[in-house]
Amino acid sequence: DLKDNMKREYPSVYQEAFEIATEWAYRQSQINMAYQQNRIVRVPYDPNLMVYTCRDIWWAWWWDDTSIRFFQIFWNEIRWIDYREWSWYWMLYVLTNIIDQKPYKYAAHIWPHDMRVHEQMSWKTRLEVAKEAWYEFTLVESPNWAVSARINIVRDLFSNMRFDSKNCLAWLNKIKNYKRKRNESTWQFM
């Protein structure tokens, strides 16, 4: 409506400017709540629990970026114990020098649907590289859900999550500052 458009275009007080700046942040309030509830603390590796990994992969014609999150499940609690990210490394390097060097006992490696893309360095798919390295993994196909539905699933699970305050800090800062995009012509969130 006109009032919201005016506030967005011409914030008149600092509170309106702050609301506009933080309005598009998906997870900022959830991260703040996790700090208040002491769910962002040191979360050590528990050798009695298996570790799961999940990845995020970005690819551009000039580089490959990847991140790995390490978590354990204890009853209904998801414990994020570690996070690593890197650029310009082959998948084989990541498998042998990052995954294998951790003291963790792994239950499963969850890979995103885009494992079928070719690595810039080797021109093999990440799937081929992982199979050549004898890695067992679960390939997650993206369900054909709306972005908002996927966001709500994570929002529902978020209260059951604890994060290691040291090992996961870079990831927490990234997701805290992640902003949703808006179509400039319709002002609808995408």
Put a short name on every predicted segment:
Residues 14, 56-61, 85, 113:
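Short, flexible loop/turn elements at secondary-structure junctions
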Residues 46-73:
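Gly/Thr-rich phosphate-binding beta-strand-loop-beta motif of the actin/hexokinase/Hsp70
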Residues 27, 41-42, 61, 91, ...:
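Polar low-complexity intrinsically disordered regions enriched in Ser/Thr and small residues
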Residues 69-189:
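Mg2+-dependent endonuclease catalytic cores in nucleic-acid-processing enzymes, primarily RNase H-like
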Residues 3, 61-64, 88, 168:
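Active-site-proximal structural scaffolding
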Residues 1-55:
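ATPase catalytic-site recognition across NTP-hydrolyzing enzymes
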